[in-house]
Structures are given as C-alpha cells and as structure tokens.
Amino acid sequence: MQRIGETFSRCLRALGVLRLSLRQIRISTGLVLFTYVTTHFLNHALANISVAAAESGLLIQKVIWQTLPGAVILYASLTTHMGLGFWPLYERRNFRFTRAEATQLVLGLCIPVLIADHVLGTRVSLSLFGTQKGYAEEFLKFWVRSPTSGVLQAILLLVVWIHGCLGIHFWLRLKPFYPPVKGVLLSLAVLLPALALLGYYQGGEAILLAVDDPVWQALHLMPDHVGTAEQNAALVSYRSWFFVVLAVAFGLTLVARALRRLGEHRRGQR
C-alpha cells in the first residue's frame, strides 16, 4: 500500500509539472502570436495613409516573419497554441468558467475557423503556387469579390485581438507592475484595432475606386497575383478538409474527456 501511495504521489507531481509546463508553453506561444498580430495590425493601420504605404510595410513584415527562423517560430507557435486550445476542454473537471475565461476559450475556438480562408489565400497559396498577394489583392477579394468574407475578416480581427488581450491580462494580473500601467495598456488595446479596422476600411474604399481602372487591373489581376481558377478551387478544397480535421479534433477531445470521466467514476466506485 505504501508503494502504491508513493506511485500515486509521483503521478500527481508529474501531472502538476505537466500542467505548469503546458501553461508556460501556452503563454510563450501566445506571446509570439500576439507579437505577430500587433505587427500585422500596425501594418493594417498604414492603409489609412494609402494602400501603397501598407504594401511597403509588408516588406518589414516579410523580414521578420517570412525568413526561415521567423516562419519556423511563427508556425510552430501557431500549431502548438491551437493544439493546446483543446486542452482546457479535456482537463477541466467541470465547465464552470468565469465570464472572461469562457469568452477567451470560445473566441480561441472560433479563430481557426475564421482565419483559415486568409491563411490559405496568402501563405499557403504562396507556398504551393507562388502567388504574390499583397494588400491590393486581398482588399479586392474582401471588398469586391466576396464582401461576406470581408465582414468575417473584420470580425476575425476583433476576435483575435480580444482573445489575445484576455490572455495577456490573465498572465499579467498578478504582476506587481501591472495595476499602475493597466489603464495605458487598455487605451493602446482599444486604439490599435480601431486604427487597423479604419485602415481596412480606407484600403477597401481605395480599391473600390481603382478596380475599374484598366491599368490597375493589368497590375493586380494577373494569375500570379490572384491565382488561377484551378488553384483557388484547390484552396477551397483544402479549407474544407481543414474544417473536417478541426471537427474531428474537437470530437476526439470530448470523447477523451468522457472516457476519462468514466474511468474516474468507475475507480471511485471500487
């Protein structure tokens, strides 16, 4: 019995270490993604000047995030953070969350669904087909060809930002330096997405005015910028498969949780 007790204690300690490690990994990957989103929003804000200014800002983005080290860090963080998003659903003994915790969890689960179209249309399209899409092509897609997708992208912007800000708040709330600067950080947290959304609107309006110009069309409607019909159809297919994978992962998480609860219940009856 003593050996069993010692083994059980070691398992509990190991579980505690695992939970701590997963929390640290979730925070670290979340900070990487929040940094990426912040630079992305700053770039969106440049569209308040002009679409050309936003395109110029992409050069800095590429230096940071499209070099091999930056891309590896970004996509490893994205994959890991998204995978760990299912962990609270499995780990929690019950679904009693605070309102802020529930909001962050629900928003986090919505992000992969909302972001799939954008990631496939930019990074995946570039990697697979070599299409060079910038702000002009993305504004064309979201403001002219698919306004519904454009609305969803604006919603995505807010969902990602609120999810990230809640994560930062949960991480910093017990830090002694946080209360004095919380007001300033809140102001910045409101200002940056507002500027990004305004840039999104201003850039879209500029493209609506330019889209009928033959010179603009010759520059931006080439297949190497917007892709061919076959390439775009393939991206739609990949998006469908991505949604299937997400649904399976979500279902397996709930099944694993149910099996764990069943095992605990049976052990409790012995």
Model-assigned labels for residue ranges:
Residues M1-R270:
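Membrane-embedded alpha-helical bundles that constitute the cytochrome b-like, heme-associated redox core
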